[in-house]
Structure formats: structure tokens, C-alpha cells
């Protein structure tokens, strides 16, 4: 059997994604980067067979994100051990990973860039603008039922499997092999896109930075007794009900900041903008996140804690150091202000488990330095009995949540082993919280260095031109 190693290419290395910005002198390079994951497209081994010096160049026009695919190589194999060379273009086309326009000729891609008008704006409506050390940014918001927003999503959706672990496309059924996408509920999807405005020559150009998609679920409220009828007359409700007025649970589904723009606070700005937007909407009862990975969990924890700390009622929550911990039986309330916890959570519109974790972080940050978990290697001051008692109460608060979350597994092991496992988990949780709290401190210091005018909501009288009436150009795909 012939050795095929020389004909194997690592898909994550072979694929080069680049942003190019249109200018009078042609397309200017903005950034190039590689994907993180390719297994959902090219298999678990993330290999492409049949080529040497393979380069899969996926260029994006940095403003409207029109893609262009170009594949090059020095040698292509024949059939080896009954293996045919991987048809990369066919996989990307037939799997609906890229729109048809991505497979057009390079000349068409370059010529169409010259035809873009100087007053081009992203699809949707301008939602927020803010300044940062890297320049001016804009966040645009639209509905997936809008053809221009739908087109942008079809161009960007390949980033989901390439950068989100286990990510799937909107409308994709993960249990089906079909590549067809069902967008019948497009009107429930909201699309937030983040752009940087850059100077290209003597003109200003948009450069795409990242995006997030949001889905609305109906929020089932606890049943309440119906009001007593005022008369014997009864009529069916009007059928012209606005579904947007119904109570909903808002779920953040996809969230991507392209690699060249990471580590600059862009993810936090986008997340906070989205969260604050939905928090102000009366119909939103809860804001949730779909299967967050570890990196996004950190971002979410930092932003949620900063948001909650702006609520005086949350800041007043403290570990109750005056309680006595019984050796047996039920534990007393461990938090001063515990009767307000659910009220605060509902006002914040944060999901129960997330609220519990962030509350634990906040309470830990108030522990005496002598007993507060830390990543630092410096010696801590000696702990008093009062310090140790406060730390023990905080530990019980965390263990209560851990036990509830893992009750089924923990109930199957012996009590002594159960206590040991909870203690080990508590130690790990403390170190994790210490890492996140350190990031919160860094973020607070960074935000303190920016001026209050770095971000502003757009008021009607600030807009000299009605951008919402400007139609974004929709190409063939």
C-alpha cells in the first residue's frame, strides 16, 4: 500500500482567510488569518488529501464581506489506495458553506469592488457608535428576514464551524445529513454586526470586525388564575396580534470576533451593547447564551459581573458572618439580603445558573485577603478565626450550587467521598473565580481610562441623513 503522507495537507494551515479593502488603486490587504477548526467540513482528522503545497485562499471584501475562493497547489495526485483527491471547491459549495458568488472568477470579484459606491453602508440600521484607541466603530442591527442581512449571514456563516467549537448554521438540523437550511423562522433572528471605520486614501471605509446572532423564544410565565369576568359576554381575542409584544427569552446563539480584532475589547463592547439593548426591552424576561465555550464564558462572566455591580441591591449582598453553621440538619440562609436574590436576578434578566456563578464571584471578591482564593504566589496574611468562618460560609454557598447541579452523580457515591469531591471542586472553582476577577479588575482599569464620550447612542436629531431608508446592495448571492 502506497504511503499517502506526502499528499496530506492540514486543513487549518492550508486555508488562508484574508480581508481586502476596495480602494482607487485596487484591493488593499487588511489582514490574513487561519481557522481554528475544520473537522466539521473536512472530517475529524482535519486533513485534505491529494495535493502538495496546497493553498485554499478565501478572500473577503472587508466591507460587504463578499467572498472569493481560489485554490492553488504545486502537484495533484491521482487515485492512491482507492482515494481520490479531495474536491475542496465541491465540498464548500455542496455543503452550503459558501454562497455561489464565492466561486466566481477573480476578475469579477475585483471588478465588482470598483463598482461599490462611496456611500455604502452595512445592512440594517445603525445602532451604536463608539471610539477606541484603534479608531471609530459602529454596530449595526438587522433582522434575518431582510434580504441584505440574510445575504450577509450567508457569506459569514462559514466562520461558525471554523471558529466555534461544535458550531452549526442557522436553520441547520444537526441530526440530518442534508445541507439544506430552513430559514422559515428568519423573522425571529436578529443580526448584530460590528465594523471599524478606517481611512483608505482620502475616503472612509468599513472593515468588518465580528457579529452575533440572537433568537427569540416565547417565555412561559407561571400560570396565574384568570380574572373574574365582568359580564356574561365573551369574545375571541383579535387575530392581529403583534408577536413582538409577547414575553420572550432572548438567546445569544452565535458570537464571533475575527482573530485580527481580538484582544482589543471588541468582544466585550459587542456583548455589552447586545445585553443592554435587550435588557431595556420590556418583553425580554431573560437573556441566555447557547452552549458557550470557555473563552466566551470568561467574556460573559466579566461583562455580567460589571453590569450587576452597577445595581446597589446586588452590591449590598454579603456573606452572613453572624450565622452559626449546624453540624446536622438544614443550613440557615447564608447571604445577607438573600430574600432579594430572585428579585435582583429577574431585574437583571440573567439566567439562574449564570446569576448564581457571578454572585459567588462577587461574594468571593469581598472575602478577607487572608482567605480569598488567589492565583498570586505571594504569601497571604495570617487568617483570623473570623476570616476562616467567613470563608467557610462562602464555601458552603458554592457547594450548595455545585450539589444541586450534580445531585444525580453525587448521590451515587459514599458521603465521605462526596465531601472530598466537593472540596476538590470548590478549590478549582475558587482559582477560576480568582482568574476572572483579576480580568474584571483589568477591564475596570481600562474602561476608567476611556472618556465618557467614547460611546454614545444615536439620537434622532444627531442623524442628518435617514440611514434606515438606505438600501444595502444585494448581489446575486
Curated annotation (Swiss-Prot):
Its EC number is 2.3.1.48. GO terms for molecular function: histone acetyltransferase activity; histone binding. Component of the HAT-B complex composed of at least HAT1 and HAT2. The HAT-B complex binds to histone H4 tail. GO terms for cellular component: chromosome, telomeric region; cytoplasm; nucleus. Acetyl-CoA binds at residues 255-257, 262-268. The keyword ATP-binding does not apply. Its main location: cytoplasm. Residues 467-477 have a biased composition (Basic and acidic residues). The gene is HAT1. Catalytic component of the histone acetylase B (HAT-B) complex. Has intrinsic substrate specificity that modifies lysine in recognition sequence GXGKXG. Involved in DNA double-strand break repair. This is Histone acetyltransferase type B catalytic subunit. It comes from the Eukaryota. One of its GO terms (biological process) is subtelomeric heterochromatin formation. It is an enzyme of class 2 (transferase). It is found in: Cytoplasm; Nucleus. Keywords: Acyltransferase, Chromatin regulator, Cytoplasm, DNA damage, DNA repair, Nucleus, Transferase. Residues 444-477 are annotated as: Disordered. It catalyses: L-lysyl-[protein] + acetyl-CoA = N(6)-acetyl-L-lysyl-[protein] + CoA + H(+). The active site is at 290 (proton donor/acceptor). Residues 44-46, 215-217 are annotated as: Interaction with histone H4 N-terminus. The record marks 189 as: Interaction with histone H4 N-terminus. Belongs to the HAT1 family.
Amino acid at each position: 500500500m502506497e504511503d499517502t503522507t506526502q499528499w496530506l495537507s492540514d486543513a487549518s494551515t492550508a486555508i488562508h482567510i484574508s480581508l481586502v479593502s476596495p480602494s482607487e488603486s485596487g484591493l488593499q490587504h487588511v489582514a490574513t488569518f487561519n481557522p481554528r477548526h475544520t473537522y466539521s467540513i473536512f472530517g475529524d482528522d482535519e486533513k485534505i488529501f491529494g495535493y502538495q503545497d496546497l493553498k485554499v485562499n478565501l478572500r473577503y471584501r472587508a466591507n460587504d464581506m463578499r467572498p472569493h475562493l481560489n485554490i492553488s497547489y504545486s502537484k495533484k495526485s491521482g487515485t492512491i489506495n482507492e482515494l481520490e483527491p479531495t474536491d475542496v471547491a465541491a465540498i464548500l459549495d455542496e455543503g452550503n458553506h459558501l454562497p455561489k458568488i464565492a466561486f466566481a472568477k477573480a476578475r469579477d470579484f475585483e471588478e465588482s469592488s470598483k463598482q461599490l459606491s462611496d456611500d455604502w453602508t452595512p445592512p440594517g440600521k445603525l445602532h451604536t457608535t463608539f471610539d477606541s484607541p484603534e479608531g471609530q466603530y459602529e454596530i449595526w442591527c438587522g433582522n434575518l428576514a431582510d434580504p441584505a442581512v440574510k445575504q450577509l449571514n450567508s457569506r459569514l456563516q462559514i466562520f461558525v464551524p471554523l471558529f466555534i467549537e461544535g458550531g452549526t448554521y442557522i436553520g441547520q438540523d444537526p441530526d440530518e445529513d442534508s445541507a439544506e437550511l430552513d430559514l422559515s423562522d428568519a423573522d425571529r433572528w436578529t443580526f448584530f454586526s460590528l465594523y471599524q471605520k478606517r481611512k483608505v486614501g482620502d475616503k472612509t471605509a468599513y472593515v468588518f470586525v465580528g457579529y452575533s446572532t440572537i433568537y427569540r423564544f416565547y417565555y412561559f410565565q407561571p400560570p396565574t388564575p384568570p380574572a373574574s369576568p365582568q359580564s356574561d359576554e365573551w369574545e375571541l381575542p383579535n387575530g392581529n396580534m403583534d408577536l413582538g409584544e409577547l414575553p420572550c427569552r432572548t438567546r445569544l446563539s452565535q458570537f464571533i470576533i475575527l482573530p485580527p480584532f481580538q484582544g482589543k475589547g471588541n468582544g466585550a463592547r459587542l456583548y455589552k451593547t447586545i445585553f443592554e439593548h435587550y435588557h431595556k426591552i420590556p418583553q425580554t424576561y431573560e437573556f441566555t447564551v447557547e452552549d458557550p465555550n470557555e473563552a466566551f464564558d470568561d467574556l460573559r462572566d466579566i461583562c455580567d459581573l460589571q453590569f450587576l455591580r452597577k445595581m446597589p441591591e446586588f452590591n449590598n449582598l454579603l456573606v452572613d458572618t453572624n450565622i452559626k453553621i449546624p453540624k446536622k440538619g438544614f443550613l440557615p440562609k447564608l447571604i445577607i439580603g438573600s430574600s432579594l436574590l430572585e428579585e435582583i436576578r429577574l431585574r437583571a434578566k440573567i439566567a439562574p445558573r449564570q446569576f448564581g456563578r457571578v454572585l459567588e464571584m462577587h461574594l468571593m471578591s469581598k472575602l478577607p485577603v487572608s482567605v480569598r482564593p488567589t492565583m498570586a504566589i505571594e504569601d497571604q496574611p495570617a487568617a483570623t478565626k473570623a476570616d476562616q468562618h467567613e470563608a467557610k460560609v462562602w464555601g458552603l454557598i458554592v457547594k450548595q450550587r455545585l450539589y444541586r447541579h450534580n445531585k444525580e452523580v453525587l448521590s451515587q457515591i459514599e458521603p465521605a467521598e462526596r465531601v472530598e469531591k466537593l472540596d476538590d471542586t470548590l478549590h478549582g472553582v475558587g482559582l477560576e473565580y480568582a482568574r476572572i476577577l483579576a480580568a474584571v479588575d483589568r477591564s475596570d482599569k481600562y474602561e476608567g481610562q476611556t472618556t465618557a464620550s467614547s460611546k454614545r447612542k444615536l439620537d434622532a436629531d444627531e442623524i442628518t441623513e435617514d440611514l434606515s431608508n438606505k438600501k444595502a446592495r444585494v448581489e446575486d448571492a
